[in-house]
A protein has these predicted regions:
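Bacterial N-terminal signal peptides
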Residues: 6-18
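Noncatalytic scaffold domains of N-terminal-nucleophile
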Residues: 23-48, 52, 60-197
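N-terminal secretory signal peptides that target proteins for export/translocation
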Residues: 1-3
Length: 197
């Protein structure tokens, strides 16, 4: 599909617009602004990733993908490739709205009977039986192919680089992760993956 004249997108947990009001300086959240638009995100690193994409010719969809992927690196407990993605995209040229539901599916074998055999009467809050098959990455691919100006690999490059090189962990995230240590210790696989040896 040829590049759309303008795309304005809203992706869960990522908001983009082309007009920035003055930031309320009584709050501590950062805002990163570029000539081609603004990107708002919980993490300044994520906002910067989106801005870089805008500055190098990407559109709002590309920036949203880059921002969401970076959030998955710097705040994996809140966002990213292990979760769902929902998007409403407005194509200004055609005046049409497009919706994408990239929520994951429960595994085929995840039945009520299976859970009952495990002694569970309700959905567990932790562990392998508490999750679905992630849909975010497939959603990123579909959005990039249909509405993006860049390839998905280009949109993901900032987050891949950050994951490989490391990043400063904000105080709030460090506190959140520290508070999760006891929960991680209850699961041998999680403990061996996420806790220091």
């Amino acid at each position: 599909m040829k590049a759309l004249a303008k795309i304005f997108g809203f992706v869960a947990l990522t908001m983009l617009s082309t007009f920035a009001n003055a930031q309320d300086r009584s709050q501590t959240r950062s805002m990163v602004i570029s000539r081609g638009g603004i990107v708002a995100a919980e993490s300044p690193l994520a906002a910067q990733a989106g801005v870089r994409i805008l500055e190098t010719g990407g559109n709002a969809i590309d920036a949203a993908i880059a921002t969401n992927a970076m959030m998955g690196v710097v705040e994996p407990m809140m966002n990213g490739m292990g979760g769902d993605l929902f998007a409403i995209v407005y194509d200004a040229k055609s005046g049409r709205l497009y919706g994408l539901n990239a929520s994951g599916w429960a595994p085929k074998g995840m039945t009520i009977e299976y859970l009952h055999k495990l002694g569970l009467l309700e959905m567990p809050q932790q562990g392998v039986n508490s999750i679905i098959v992630p849909g975010a990455v497939d959603g990123w691919q579909k959005l990039a192919e249909r509405f993006g100006r860049k390839k998905l690999a280009d949109d993901l490059a900032p987050s891949i680089r950050t994951a490989e090189e490391g990043f400063p962990v904000p105080e709030w995230d460090a506190a959140y992760w520290s508070a999760s240590v006891n929960d991680l210790r209850t699961n041998a696989a999680a403990a061996s993956t996420y806790l220091p040896k």
